[in-house]
Amino acid sequence: PKVVFERPKHRGRMWKRAWVDAVDQLISWTEMFRLVQNEGLGMISQGTREWTNYIVRADVTPHLATRAGIAVRVQGLTRFYALMVTRDQKVQLVKSLHQESVLAESEFGWSFGDTLHMSLGVDGDELWGEINGQVVLSARDSSLDSGAIGLVIADGRSATHKVEVTKTD
């Protein structure tokens, strides 16, 4: 895949319907998306099951959230890999296969309202996550081999202006 998702310049709203919406509120404010999830984990996703090896890049600005980030190989709300920052100053590479497990974790200092330029790549069984241009985590897992991309939020809200998906070389 090679695609960029940005808020269109026109005032139409149909473009939002191309996203699978599984959050309490999905608002187009000054940013393309403002995701609000009052309790638990929520996600919006876009793409196809045929997407295999790619990198997703997005700006993520968490506000009063327990976790926020981006997801790859999304096959539903309980089947995905995600790169997320947590309220307790960590970054996690998470696998959700009907139950969540942390594949890799590290300390990562950030503040609410910071815009984090996140990317998560998958190629075969390799996963790697970057924040602000620095590789922060990597892991290997072959449980999910394809799927869409997503924006993830837990117990709070986050904002995103642009999402880009490119095929790995």
Each model region followed by its residue ranges:
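Extracellular glycan-recognition regions
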Residues: 1-169
